Swiss-Prot record:
It is an enzyme of class 1 (oxidoreductase). Residues 199-354 are annotated as: Peptide methionine sulfoxide reductase A. Disulfide bonds join C68-C71, C440-C495. PANTHER family: MITOCHONDRIAL PEPTIDE METHIONINE SULFOXIDE REDUCTASE (PTHR42799:SF2). One of its GO terms (cellular component) is cytoplasm. In the N-terminal section; belongs to the thioredoxin family. It catalyses: L-methionyl-[protein] + [thioredoxin]-disulfide + H2O = L-methionyl-(S)-S-oxide-[protein] + [thioredoxin]-dithiol; [thioredoxin]-disulfide + L-methionine + H2O = L-methionine (S)-S-oxide + [thioredoxin]-dithiol; L-methionyl-[protein] + [thioredoxin]-disulfide + H2O = L-methionyl-(R)-S-oxide-[protein] + [thioredoxin]-dithiol. One of its GO terms (biological process) is protein modification process. This is Peptide methionine sulfoxide reductase MsrA/MsrB. Keywords: Disulfide bond, Electron transport, Multifunctional enzyme, Oxidoreductase, Redox-active center, Transport.
C-alpha cells in the first residue's frame, strides 16, 4: 500500500531493532494460561483485572503501547467501546506490557499513564509482557479473542474498527476484511484525466518490512506491497514460508510511474540497501525466504536487470547472488505485514530507509512554489454561531482541541484538486497540490498555502512534547506538524483533523471567492 511518509524513528536512527526477526513465532503453549494470568493482574489504577472479567463471556483484549501513535489516537475510541452496550456480550479490556517490546518500565509507565484522562478505559498492566509473549504479540495495536472456555480463538494484528470488533465477538472466524472503511477515490473516468504510465517489478531483499517502507518513500513509486514470490505452494501464510519450506521469497511488489522512474532507477535504489553478495541472508534474517532477487513479468526486462547486475558486480570482489528470473507467482502477505513500519515506527528494520531520500546521480528535486495571501480578511464567528453551524465533532476539534478517530474522515483519502479552508472562518489553509497519503489516518500535507496562515504551539498532552498547529485568523485547532514528511518537499508532515477543514473543489473556487488561489492547485 502506498504511504509516502515518515517512519520517524527509523529515519532518525537508521531503523531500530525490535525483536531481531522479521515476524513472529507461532503462538506458544503458554497461551492456554492467558485467562488465569490475566485475572491475577491489576489495572493502571490498581484495581483487580478480575473486575472486568465475567466468566460467561468471551474476552476481547487490545494490546497497545505508549510509543505507538496509532494506539494513542484510539484510546478514546476504545474507552467508548468499553462503555457501549453493543459490546456488552464480551469482556473488553486493554493490556499494556511495561518492559516488553520497547515499552516504558513499569513505574515510568504508571506515572505516564496517570497523566492521561481515560477514567473508564480498562488498562491492565502486564509487567514484562508475559501475556503478549505467550500470544506472540509483536505488532501494536493487536487484538486477541479469548473464548468463554478460556481458549485462544483468534489473534488480529493491527487496528480494527467498531464493525470489525463486533463481528469478531460474534464470530471468531468472521471475514474482517469485508468490513474495512471505504474511502472516496478520485474519478479516473473523466475525459480530461491522465492515466498514469505505471510499471511493476518484484524485488526480494530480505525482510519485506524495511524494503516496502524504503520504496514507499521514493518519489515516483506509486505503490509497494509486501508478499511472497516464486514458491512451490499456493496462498502461503507467513508460517508456511518460515517453517514449512515452501520456497517463497519475501518480496515487495513495486509499482512505479514510468514517466518519473525507469527500471534502472528502481534497481539503483534497490542495490543501495541490499548486500547482493549475501546468499539467503540480509541483516539479521537468514533463510531461503530472505534471498535476493529481481522478478520480472516482461521478458524484455531481463536484459535491463542483467546490465544492472553486471554494473553492480564491479563494486564487489565476491560474486553477486541476486536472482534474475521471471515471476512465477506472487501472493500478498497478511494485512498486519502491510505498511508494518507505519503501524509500528519502532519496528524491526534491517535497512537504512533514509537512503530513499538521496537523489540518484543526475536527478534533481522540484523547487518550491511561491506563496502569498492576506489572512486578515477572515474572521471567527461568535461561539453561539459556531455551535449552531458546526457539527459536534467540528466544534470539539476546532474549539476544544479534540482529535477525530484515525482513518475516520473522508478527507484522509480525498485527492481531488482544490483547497482546504478553515471550517470556522473560511481562511485558505492547504492545497491538494501539497497533500499526500502519509498512512497516519489523518489528512496530511507537506506545507500550508502560506506559512502565515497557521501558528505553532508546544503541546504536552499524552505526556509528550509535540507541535500543535492552529489557524491564524480563527485560532482553530487543526492538528500537529511533525518533521517526518517527504524530504524532497521540505520534510514536514502537517497532520490535520478533517473536521477542522472544508474542501473547496477546483471547479467551485471561483464561485466561492477563492479563484485567485487556483494557481496553487494542481
Amino acid at each position: 500500500m502506498k504511504h509516502r511518509t515518515f517512519f520517524s524513528l527509523c529515519a532518525k536512527f537508521g531503523c531500530l531493532l525490535a525483536l531481531g526477526a522479521c515476524s513472529p513465532k507461532i503462538v506458544d503453549a503458554g497461551a492456554a494460561t492467558v485467562p488465569h494470568t490475566l485475572s491475577t493482574l491489576k489495572t493502571a489504577d490498581n484495581r483487580p483485572a478480575s473486575v472486568y472479567l465475567k466468566k460467561d463471556k468471551p474476552t476481547l483484549i487490545k494490546f497497545w503501547a505508549s510509543w505507538c501513535p496509532l494506539c494513542l489516537s484510539e484510546l478514546g475510541q476504545t474507552e467508548k467501546w468499553a462503555q457501549d452496550a453493543k459490546f456488552s456480550s464480551a469482556n473488553l479490556i486493554t493490556v499494556a506490557s511495561p518492559g516488553f517490546l520497547h515499552e516504558k518500565k513499569d513505574g515510568d509507565f504508571q506515572k505516564w499513564y496517570a497523566g492521561l484522562n481515560y477514567p473508564k478505559l480498562p488498562v491492565v498492566t502486564d509487567n514484562g509482557g508475559t501475556i503478549a509473549q505467550s500470544l506472540n504479540i509483536s505488532v501494536y495495536p493487536s487484538w486477541a479473542l479469548i473464548g468463554k472456555d478460556s481458549d485462544v480463538q483468534r489473534i488480529v494484528k493491527g487496528s480494527i474498527n467498531e464493525a470489525q470488533a463486533l463481528a469478531l465477538i460474534r464470530d471468531p472466524n468472521a471475514d474482517l476484511g469485508s468490513l474495512k472503511h471505504s474511502f472516496y477515490k478520485p474519478d479516473t473516468q473523466k475525459k480530461d484525466s491522465k492515466i498514469m504510465n505505471t510499471r511493476t517489478i518484484y524485488l526480494a531483499g530480505g525482510c519485506f518490512w524495511g524494503l516496502e517502507a524504503y520504496f514507499q518513500r521514493i518519489d515516483g513509486v506509486v505503490d509497494a506491497v509486501s508478499g511472497y514470490a516464486n514458491g512451490n505452494t499456493k496462498n502461503p501464510s507467513y508460517e508456511d514460508v518460515s517453517y514449512r519450506h515452501t520456497g517463497h521469497a519475501e518480496t515487495v511488489k513495486v509499482t512505479y510511474d514510468a514517466d518519473k522512474l525507469s527500471l534502472d532507477d528502481i534497481l539503483q535504489y534497490f542495490f543501495r540497501v541490499v548486500d547482493p553478495t549475501s546468499l539467503n541472508k540480509q541483516g539479521n534474517d537468514t533463510g531461503t525466504q530472505y534471498r535476493s532477487g529481481v522478478y520480472y513479468t516482461d521478458p524484455a526486462e531481463k536484459a535491463v536487470i542483467a546490465a544492472a547486475l553486471k554494473r553492480e558486480q564491479q563494486k564487489y570482489q565476491l560474486p553477486l547472488v541476486v536472482e534474475n528470473e521471471p515471476l512465477k507467482n506472487f501472493y500478498d502477505a497478511e494485512e498486519y505485514h502491510q505498511d508494518y513500519l507505519i503501524k509500528n515506527p519502532n519496528g524491526y528494520c534491517h535497512i537504512d530507509i533514509r537512503k530513499a531520500d538521496e537523489p540518484l546521480p543526475g536527478k534533481t528535486k522540484t523547487a518550491p512554489q511561491g506563496k502569498g495571501f492576506d489572512a486578515a480578511t477572515y474572521k471567527k464567528p461568535s461561539d453561539a454561531e459556531l455551535k449552531r453551524t458546526l457539527t459536534e465533532e467540528q466544534y470539539q476539534v476546532t474549539q476544544n482541541s479534540a482529535t477525530e478517530y484515525a482513518f475516520s474522515h473522508e478527507y484522509d483519502h480525498l485527492f481531488k484538486p482544490g483547497i482546504y479552508v478553515d471550517v470556522v472562518s473560511g481562511e485558505p489553509l492547504f492545497s491538494s497540490a501539497d497533500k499526500y497519503d502519509s498512512g497516519c489516518g489523518w489528512p496530511s500535507f507537506t506545507r500550508p498555502i502560506d506559512a502565515k496562515s497557521v501558528t505553532e504551539h508546544d503541546d504536552f498532552s499524552y505526556n509528550m512534547r509535540r507541535t500543535e498547529v492552529r489557524s491564524h485568523a480563527a485560532d482553530s485547532h487543526l492538528g500537529h506538524v511533525f518533521p517526518d514528511g517527504p524530504r524532497d518537499k521540505g520534510g514536514l508532515r502537517y497532520c490535520i483533523n478533517g473536521a477542522s477543514l472544508k474542501f473547496i473543489p477546483l471547479e467551485q473556487m471561483d464561485a466561492a471567492g477563492y479563484g485567485a488561489l487556483k494557481g496553487k492547485v494542481k
